[in-house]
């Protein structure tokens, strides 16, 4: 199969398309495992469909037999793909056989003839021709939604901060008593959900681009995983484990990112937590590894994701001959990164203190092949949808050590769900520029630098040479067909580096220009305020209303009451010979003309926090942008209140 087969099943990012996801939602037994964005080690995505057999374990006593059946089928040439609940690990220790377990399956795997695979670099889709043809035809004829939309999730924590702090205090007692060194303490967030699982997964993977994503249709349950963590990868006799321990929120800009990344790298607490888990996993894999083959290849690397930085380490080992699937999981599962150390005693503490079974959260999702290959994630950042009860659960947790602070740990847990609550739709980067038939581009280096910085921040593909080539073509078209004058040129860059450019004639402003305040209070922690993107619905709606009322722009404040900016301009006031403009940290976009003014010797411009009264009492009020430059504005008399 080549490009032609891939058209209807893949989107332009090389991920499974909305239609393919919708088909997977309608067909129990389907497993999609995706690598996004598809790095060198994770360039292949998989679609397992039409299982030959389903292997389930509903009880602890049934787990071993289920694993043996999977092992047998894989040796006979089948592929196996599915998931294990955290509590499936109780089956490997006699002392856990009486512990609480979830009502959902402890283990669920489909056995398949062969998956459909996608090479993320080439975009080539391959697989059994009958399966590809069947799915393409099914996708073509299925009842489709008009667009992939879903309801907003309103999560409630199943454990209050007070109850969490009570459990946290008991963990500290166990640490002081020497029972444990670290406990990964977790709880659930829950929400009502009756919309499309496929649409929600499509939005989740836009918001959290990871190498170990999964969509698993178990029937009444659907698992949506955006896990960044590799549990283990098997390649013949070579094993790789990559525990993740250590988290910090990303900044709002590249500069803040650098500060946060350095803070995590230099955190003694996080390094100590990571080292504990590395030692635990070295011991676990050592049970099935050739003597002397276990080594730590990398320690405490910092990896960047959409909303957080994570610290990871990489462990490699060579398996002993004859080690099969049951023994691998018996030795490794669950991952020590989601238990703590020492593992067995800590699992007992977790069972005592956590209020409900974890289920598939902190379990694992992945596949085995007949060629002794396997990839499994640690099922964090994983949403479990129960279609019968029309509900969704999302687990969160953190590693608690002796110097942890309970309030901070609770906040870290909630942080890990932030990507579900942000605006999850895809977006592009924008630059709105001025081109003049006599002077050419205005502030072009400022525009390109800002787009490059935002592209780096969000992980967009950016090529300065390609952009300049596109802009040269625009100039040729304008000179050939549009005549003299000034033009508004709007450039949009999408995540994969595709460029779209539109232009229109820029008319002169006539008469006095007026502005008013917006009633909205913006959150200065919203990272999208610091980048010019298509994700600007509030700005567009407020500007449209203001223009209909005859205003040039509408001015915003943040939740602290500080002035930020206009919907299409930055704000300045003049006091004597000095111009003042709000600092970026208030929630301000680094406008290109604003940046030009701050670096110019012609104007005395400095940053200062401003409030509505400062604007109302200023000697003069201005707004500025790259299209209009510096524009003197005023409040009409009837709008002279904040």
Give the residues covered by each predicted segment:
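Extended alpha-helical targeting/anchoring segments
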Residues: 2-432, 554-558, 642
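Helix-start/capping segments and mature chain N-termini
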Residues: 274, 307, 311, 408, ...
């Amino acid at each position: 199969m080549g490009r032609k087969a891939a058209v209807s099943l893949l989107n332009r990012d090389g991920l499974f398309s909305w239609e393919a996801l919708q088909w997977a939602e309608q067909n129990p037994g389907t497993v999609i495992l995706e690598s996004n964005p598809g790095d060198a080690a994770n360039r292949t995505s998989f679609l397992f469909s039409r299982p030959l057999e389903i292997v389930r374990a509903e009880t602890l006593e049934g787990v071993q037999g289920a694993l043996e059946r999977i092992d047998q089928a894989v040796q006979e040439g089948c592929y196996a793909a599915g998931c294990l609940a955290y509590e499936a690990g109780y089956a490997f220790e006699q002392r856990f056989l009486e512990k609480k377990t979830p009502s959902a399956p402890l283990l669920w795997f489909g056995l398949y003839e062969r998956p459909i695979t996608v090479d993320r670099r080439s975009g080539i889709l391959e697989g059994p021709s009958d399966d590809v043809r069947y799915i393409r035809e099914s996708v073509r004829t299925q009842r489709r939604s008009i667009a992939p939309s879903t309801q907003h999730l309103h999560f409630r924590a199943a454990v209050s901060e007070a109850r969490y702090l009570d459990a946290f205090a008991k963990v500290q007692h166990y640490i002081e008593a020497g029972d444990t060194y670290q406990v990964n303490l977790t709880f659930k967030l829950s929400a009502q959900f009756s919309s499309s699982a496929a649409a929600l997964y499509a939005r989740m993977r836009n918001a959290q681009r990871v190498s170990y994503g999964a969509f698993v249709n178990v029937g009444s349950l659907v698992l949506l995983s955006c896990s960044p963590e590799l549990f283990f990868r098997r390649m013949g006799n070579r094993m790789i484990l990559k525990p993740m321990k250590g988290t910090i929120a990303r900044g709002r800009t590249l500069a803040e990112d650098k500060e946060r990344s350095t803070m995590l790298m230099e955190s003694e607490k996080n390094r100590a937590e990571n080292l504990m888990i590395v030692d635990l996993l070295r011991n676990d894999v050592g049970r099935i590894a050739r003597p002397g083959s276990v080594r730590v290849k990398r320690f405490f690397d910092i990896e960047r994701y959409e909303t957080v930085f994570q610290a990871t380490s990489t462990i490699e080992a060579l398996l002993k001959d004859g080690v099969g699937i049951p023994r691998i999981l018996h030795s490794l599962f669950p991952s020590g990164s989601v238990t703590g150390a020492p593992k067995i005693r800590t699992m007992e503490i977790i069972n005592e203190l956590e209020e409900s079974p974890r289920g598939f959260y902190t379990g694992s999702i992945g596949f085995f092949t007949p060629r002794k290959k396997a990839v499994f994630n640690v099922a964090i950042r994983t949403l479990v949808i129960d279609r019968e009860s029309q509900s969704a659960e999302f687990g969160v947790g953190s590693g608690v050590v002796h110097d942890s602070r309970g309030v901070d740990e609770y906040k870290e847990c909630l942080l890990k769900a932030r990507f579900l609550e942000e605006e999850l739709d895809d977006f592009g980067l924008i630059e709105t520029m001025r081109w003049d038939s006599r002077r050419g581009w205005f502030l072009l280096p400022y525009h390109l630098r800002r787009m490059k910085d935002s592209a780096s921040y969000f992980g967009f593909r950016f090529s300065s040479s390609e952009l300049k080539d596109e802009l040269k073509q625009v100039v040729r078209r304008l000179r050939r067909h549009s005549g003299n004058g000034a033009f508004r040129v709007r450039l949009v860059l999408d995540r994969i580096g595709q460029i779209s450019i539109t232009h229109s004639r820029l008319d002169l402003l006539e008469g006095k220009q007026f502005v008013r305040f917006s009633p909205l209070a913006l959150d200065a922690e919203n990272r999208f305020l610091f980048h010019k993107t298509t994700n600007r619905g509030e700005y567009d709606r407020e500007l449209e209303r203001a223009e209909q009322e005859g205003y040039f722009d509408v001015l915003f404040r943040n939740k602290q009451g500080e002035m930020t900016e206009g919907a299409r301009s930055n704000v300045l006031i003049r006091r004597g010979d000095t111009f003042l403009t709000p600092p970026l940290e208030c929630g301000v976009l680094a406008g290109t003309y604003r940046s030009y003014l701050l670096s110019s010797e012609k104007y005395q411009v400095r940053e200062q926090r401003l409030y509505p009264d400062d604007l109302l009492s200023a000697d003069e009020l201005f707004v500025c942008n790259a299209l209009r430059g510096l524009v003197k504005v005023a409040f009409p008399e009837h709008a002279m209140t904040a």
